[in-house]
């Protein structure tokens, strides 16, 4: 559990901020009221100039030199945590950094918990909660598109938007209070209509961002692409062709792939998780049955589907099952029908399959370059460009709840129930505030910041 000291001098924390292991450099970070004091004792210097790199030898309690390092002092509040911070850049490897941390602990620091540096930045008002979430996700970002979205959030664009909406709602709430307190006074006749229009405009904008964010929800974590088809249709060959290496076993024996195989690759500016699934047919044994069940789950969870059919053969009963699955799952996902084995004579003709976006390919002989280009262009359309985005389930839930409150507020205003109208406007304000500055105390924040890496 992340905790903070309630005194005016919170504990000084220390952690390795770079990945543990062999490397040219390692960065050890101190934060807290005694960070400078501890760094001066380690380096045996009488001062460090803020924001200047200082080359110094580091010493232990036995007067043994531990390393030659660079120290950078960030004076509060101009640091990541808004506290006194010292970064120690020492030589890489685990041993040197561990010795430095051990000495700092002996001088009064304690080991930082996961995410505690960012937690302190949040508590000290340097960042809001949406920015803290962006930091955690930015560390894990795997694509240019997710990087751009998260960087905008880190810069505070979501926070500024939320504060703008809150400001508008506060003005509306003021109208409610005036109308309640001065019910007998003559107020402008069109005031209620203007307030209704303003609420509807705010709700419409929030709904647009909410729906757009749901549609693009896979952008940050990576889009999921499922390859489906009957056994022995060429799914594993296609996976290998997309990856440019032999990931899956390719065999003429039907049912070779009995479980889902997941790999990832970059498509243009996007990170995509490709799932090669077990062939759809009547299961021959319990293990194959489990594999087929996982295939159906992968289909339900996918953002895009590549449905593979053998163009050199007429449709089989298993192919008809695939067609039924496509009909059932064509909402909220892109489907591309691939007629494989185009290097052989074409026997398959089916108007329903050809009504989907489709391509003729040969997974063994080539032709996947055009396919990759098409998928990348689809993902570009899905990305949404520079549009503001909610990047966590928590943010989505807050906006969804705020929309519910705004709908109730609008209805109550039209009915003339001003006190209930004010109550629901306050509810919307609270829900939106949770995006950047939650009322909840330790439990929610412990879960959030506990997902960060040590040293962040």
From Swiss-Prot:
EC annotation from Swiss-Prot or TrEMBL: 3.6.-.-
Cofactor requirement: K(+)
Positions that bind Mg(2+): 236, 257
Top-level taxonomic group: Bacteria
Binding annotation for (6S)-5-formyl-5,6,7,8-tetrahydrofolate: 29, 87, 126, 456
Biological processes, Gene Ontology terms: tRNA methylation; tRNA wobble uridine modification
SUPFAM superfamilies: P-loop containing nucleoside triphosphate hydrolases
Broad class of the protein's primary localization: cytoplasm
Function: Exhibits a very high intrinsic GTPase hydrolysis rate. Involved in the addition of a carboxymethylaminomethyl (cmnm) group at the wobble position (U34) of certain tRNAs, forming tRNA-cmnm(5)s(2)U34.
HAMAP family to which the protein is assigned, alphabetical: GTPase_MnmE
Self-association and partners: Homodimer. Heterotetramer of two MnmE and two MnmG subunits.
Identification of the protein by name: tRNA modification GTPase MnmE
């Amino acid at each position: 559990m992340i905790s903070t000291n309630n005194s005016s001098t919170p504990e000084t924390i220390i952690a390795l901020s770079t990945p543990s292991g062999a490397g040219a450099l390692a960065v050890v970070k101190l934060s807290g009221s005694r960070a400078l004091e501890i760094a001066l004792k380690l380096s045996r210097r009488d001062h460090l100039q803020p924001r200047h790199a200082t080359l110094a030898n580091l010493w232990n309690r036995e007067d043994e030199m531990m390393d030659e390092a660079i120290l950078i002092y960030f004076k509060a509040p101009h640091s990541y945590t808004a506290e006194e911070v010292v970064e120690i850049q020492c030589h890489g490897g685990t041993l040197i950094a561990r010795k430095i941390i051990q000495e700092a602990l002996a001088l009064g620091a304690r080991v930082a918990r996961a995410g505690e540096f960012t937690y302190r930045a949040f508590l000290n008002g340097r960042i809001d909660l949406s920015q803290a979430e962006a930091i955690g996700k930015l560390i894990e970002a795997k694509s240019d598109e997710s990087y751009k979205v998260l960087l905008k959030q880190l810069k505070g664009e979501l926070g500024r938007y939320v504060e703008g909406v809150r400001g508008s709602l506060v003005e509306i709430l003021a109208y409610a209070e005036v109308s309640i307190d001065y019910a007998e006074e003559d107020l402008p006749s069109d005031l209620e209509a203007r307030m209704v229009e303003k609420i509807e405009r705010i709700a419409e904008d929030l709904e647009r961002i909410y729906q757009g964010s749901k549609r693009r929800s896979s952008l940050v974590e990576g889009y999921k692409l499922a390859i489906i088809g009957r056994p022995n249709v060429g799914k594993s060959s296609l996976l290998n062709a997309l990856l440019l290496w032999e990931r899956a076993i390719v065999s003429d024996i039907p049912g070779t792939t009995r479980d889902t195989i997941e790999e990832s690759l970059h498509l243009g500016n996007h990170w995509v998780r490709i799932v090669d699934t077990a062939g759809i047919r009547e299961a021959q044994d319990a293990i194959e049955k489990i594999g087929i069940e996982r295939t159906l789950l992968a289909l339900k969870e996918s953002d895009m589907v590549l449905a593979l059919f053998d163009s050199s053969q007429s449709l089989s009963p298993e192919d008809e099952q695939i067609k039924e699955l496509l009909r059932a799952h064509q909402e909220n996902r892109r489907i591309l029908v691939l007629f494989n084995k185009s290097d052989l004579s074409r026997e398959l003709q089916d108007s329903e399959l050809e009504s989907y976006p489709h391509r003729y390919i040969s997974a063994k002989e080539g032709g996947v370059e055009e396919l990759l280009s098409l998928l990348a262009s689809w993902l570009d359309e899905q990305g949404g460009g520079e549009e503001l985005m909610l990047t966590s389930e928590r943010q989505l839930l807050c906006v969804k709840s705020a929309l519910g409150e705004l709908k109730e507020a609008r209805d109550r205003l039209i009915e003339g129930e001003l006190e209930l109208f004010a109550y629901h406007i306050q509810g919307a304000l609270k829900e939106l505030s949770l995006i950047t500055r939650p009322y909840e105390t330790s439990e929610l924040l412990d879960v959030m910041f506990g997902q960060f890496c040590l040293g962040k």
